[in-house]
């Protein structure tokens, strides 16, 4: 455990951020799975939005976001 006050604060913040990031990533995955289970335009927009939000917050790389959205759009087109 950290002894210095600033290190203690950073450790607490890291725990909070980890929970927040995990929740955001989980929401993205849930939106993608919902679309894959029942491909529709509405679910595609929701999944695409969730992917964009995760990319903006730095949870996933921009290339992964682009790749994921491209794969979803091909599933929608079929």
From Swiss-Prot:
Function of the protein: Binds directly to 16S ribosomal RNA.
Family from the record: Belongs to the bacterial ribosomal protein bS20 family.
Gene3D superfamilies registered for this protein in UniProt: Ribosomal protein S20
One matching Pfam family: Ribosomal_S20p
GO biological process, one term: translation
Species of the source: Streptococcus pneumoniae serotype 19F (strain G54)
Superkingdom of source: Bacteria
Annotated keywords: Ribonucleoprotein, Ribosomal protein, RNA-binding, rRNA-binding
Protein name: Small ribosomal subunit protein bS20
InterPro entries in the cross-refs: Ribosomal_bS20, Ribosomal_bS20_sf
Gene Ontology cellular component annotations, sorted alphabetically: cytosol; small ribosomal subunit
Molecular-function GO term, any one: structural constituent of ribosome
């Amino acid at each position: 455990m950290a002894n210095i006050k600033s290190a203690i604060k950073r450790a607490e913040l890291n725990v909070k951020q980890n929970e927040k990031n995990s929740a955001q990533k989980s929401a993205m995955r849930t939106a993608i799975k919902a679309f894959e289970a029942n491909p529709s335009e509405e679910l595609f927009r929701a999944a695409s939005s969730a992917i964009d939000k995760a990319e903006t917050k730095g949870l996933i790389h921009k290339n992964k976001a682009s790749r994921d959205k491209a794969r979803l759009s091909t599933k929608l087109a079929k």
